[in-house]
């Protein structure tokens, strides 16, 4: 299965890229995880913010393949314990060829992007820095995969 994390923001610090890469490369051949970055648009007043989010949304939608099963990362989404996420990952692997997980910009995701998604996943009620979310998502998916494969990484 191909898993693509589409994230608004580029020019991340090295520790973000290294953290993401560390988890993304731990899967065996059955999962290929990659990252597509959408450039963060310049922000200023409310009008510029709306235009920036609109442009980012168009780029997110353009980055999706028609066959992608789309999951947005959103505070209003479903929370999962690690074991529940493992079951969800199993479902995605059985029912989708490719999975796209979308991390929005500072103002979140547009209605158009949310409407394209089949699901929405919340990492919890905390506000998290978007660069860190990339690493958290990669780690959570690796942990879910580890649970499904009885790998010692996850010790409940």
Curated annotation (Swiss-Prot):
Keywords from the named record: Cytoplasm, Methyltransferase, rRNA processing, S-adenosyl-L-methionine, Transferase
Top EC category: transferase
Primary localization class, coarse: cytoplasm
Annotated CDD domains: RlmH-like (cd18081)
Compartment annotation: Cytoplasm
Pfam family, any one: SPOUT_MTase
Catalytic activity: pseudouridine(1915) in 23S rRNA + S-adenosyl-L-methionine = N(3)-methylpseudouridine(1915) in 23S rRNA + S-adenosyl-L-homocysteine + H(+)
Residues given in the record as S-adenosyl-L-methionine binding sites: 73, 104, 123-128
EC number: 2.1.1.177
Keyword Plastid: no
Cellular compartments per GO CC: cytoplasm
Role summary: Specifically methylates the pseudouridine at position 1915 (m3Psi1915) in 23S rRNA.
Similarity comment text for this entry: Belongs to the RNA methyltransferase RlmH family.
Protein name: Ribosomal RNA large subunit methyltransferase H
Organism: Dichelobacter nodosus (strain VCS1703A)
């Amino acid at each position: 299965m191909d898993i693509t994390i589409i994230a608004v923001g580029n020019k991340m610090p090295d520790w973000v890229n290294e953290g993401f890469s560390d988890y993304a490369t731990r899967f065996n051949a059955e999962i290929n995880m990659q990252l597509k970055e959408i450039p963060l648009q310049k922000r200023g007043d409310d009008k510029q913010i709306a235009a920036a989010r609109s442009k980012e949304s168009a780029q997110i939608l353009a980055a999706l393949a028609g066959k992608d099963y789309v999951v947005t990362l959103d505070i209003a989404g479903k929370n999962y314990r690690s074991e529940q996420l493992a079951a969800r990952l199993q479902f995605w692997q059985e029912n989708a060829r490719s999975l796209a997980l979308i991390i929005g910009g500072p103002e979140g995701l547009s209605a158009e992007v949310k409407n394209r998604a089949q699901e929405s996943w919340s990492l919890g009620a905390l506000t998290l820095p978007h660069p860190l979310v990339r690493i958290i998502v990669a780690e959570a998916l690796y942990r879910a995969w580890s649970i499904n494969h009885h790998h010692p990484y996850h010790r409940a």
